Amino acid sequence: MLQQLLLVSVLVSSPPSGRDVIKAMHDRYAGKWYRTLSFVQQNTATRPDGSQQHSVWREYAALPGKLRIEFVPPDSGNGILFVNDSQFVFAADTIGNVSAFIHPLMVLGFDVYLDPVERTIARLERLKIDLAAVHEDTWEGRPVYVVGAKPGDLRTRQFWVDRERLVFVRLLEPGQRDTTRTNDIRFNKYQPAGSAWLSAEVAFLVDGHERWLEQYTEIKTDRVLTDSLFDPRRWPARSN
């Protein structure tokens, strides 16, 4: 408790480092964050001409570090598995592609509360986020810490954290295919989940225009999920 109070004092009295912010996030919810999560995800893709396409996914997470996405209908065998900082893409229950991938939204939205602080820091450094660059700003009327960029810089890869709740709310980064564009990912509509929090909507914008929206329903936390759901060798295993 004393250590947590000292850390809060540092955050309040002086500009924190990115390490301070990560440690504060971890310590605030130590032993309180849910270990599993499942939900139905309603997707809306918006094309540049304004037309939309809708889809449904089912997702299961075992935290830290494991996420299973099943494209509906589940028996299609299509989906994606994230585990051990790797991405497995499945088509008709067969692995089509495997690649190394640190999922930044998993790290910042979930794993940060359960992984050791040093592991989170190491993963963020591998994602090329400058943890020494920190400033304060306001987002949706609430004060936030911005880690990874200087004031006024909305191009460099950076993440935003609600200063009071210590939850991740925003990620900005150059586009992966076109680095002249800016990707803006927002965790919206936070709601209590026991003693923790859950964002029930995630928006993906490109240069200020929404291109993908995820809305979560049938949300369940700390439900028992079998290990087979997250084993790429046993992808056909499905949860009901």
Which residues fall in each region the model found?
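Gly/Pro-enriched, hydrophobic low-complexity segments
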Residues: 139-236
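N-terminal mature ectodomain segment of secretory-pathway/periplasmic proteins
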Residues: 14-96, 128, 132
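A short, sequence-level motif marking secondary-structure junctions
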Residues: 59-63, 84-87, 104-107, 162-164, ...
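Compositionally biased, intrinsically disordered low-complexity segments enriched
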Residues: 5-6, 43, 160
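Sec-dependent N-terminal signal peptides
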Residues: 2-12
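Short, surface-exposed linear segments at secondary-structure transitions and domain or protein termini
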Residues: 63-69, 89-91, 109-112, 169, ...
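Residue-level marker for the onset of beta-strands and adjacent loop->beta junctions
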Residues: 55-56, 65, 76-78, 133, ...
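Flexible, processing/modification-adjacent segments and terminal tails
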Residues: 14-23, 33, 86-155, 175-181, ...
